[in-house]
Amino acid sequence: MKTILVTGSSSGIGKSTAIKFVKAGWNVVSWGRRFKKMEAWKNNLPLTDQKRIFIQCVDVMSASQVTEAIQLIPENFKVIDLLVNNAGLALGKSPIHEGLIKDWEQMIDTNLKGLLYVTKVISPEMVNRKSGQIINIGSIAGKETYPDGNVYNATKFAVDALTRGMRQDLSQHQIRVSQISPGMVETEFSEVRFHGDKKKAQQVYKNMSPLKANDIADLIYYISNTPSHVNVADVLILPTQQA
């Protein structure tokens, strides 16, 4: 039985991915900052599925938490076949001279450093086994800049570059590294970006049909099931109304 580790799985894409894979028969290690939210969706699943999910409260911004969490994973979940680096966020949307340093730091610490911390503790065992797969969740914001996106754009451009570098480093060890770069996905993303302002967040998706978290989970599952000689390097996925 294969095992997937998903970061940022309290809600949104991470939650949908965890549920998708456990229903497909995988073991799932679910990491997120909001333990009760993970516990709630886990408890809504059939008991047979619940037994194949191990949830941990982990903030990927903390290298020490990440290192400690790995040590606490039960033996039957320890061999990670697929790592999905999903944890990420945008905070604020303002010109560079009006941005908040605390927002910048949290985006850099989560979107970039968090991805590095998790990859650092998972990838060595993949190298030893000469097998494994890593899927990084990037963004269209890592392909194109937009006004007031500045630091968020920078973190996602960095994820794009890091994914390419990881693929170059790890391909010799038969490890596949992919990136999924979504456009607008209707999750808590915009509400978080606007510091809990729900009205402002709702305007982001006005007069359009955005992607859903399940759309990205389906794509992750598809990539995970390609033959071992196939590496889907990068996928840009957009709502039909976003061009």
Stretches with model-predicted labels:
Residues 94-96, 103-108:
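Substrate-binding pocket helix/loop in short-chain dehydrogenase/reductase
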Residues 119, 155:
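Active-site helix of classical SDR
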Residues 179-180, 199-243:
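C-terminal helical subdomain
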Residues 57-69, 101:
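The beta1-alpha1 cofactor-binding region of Rossmann-like NAD(H)/NADP(H)-dependent oxidoreductases
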Residues 24-40:
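Conserved glycine-rich Rossmann-like NAD(P)H-binding loop of the short-chain dehydrogenase/reductase
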Residues 139:
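Residue(s) in the substrate-gating loop at a strand-loop-helix junction
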Residues 10-11:
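Conserved glycine-rich cofactor-binding loop
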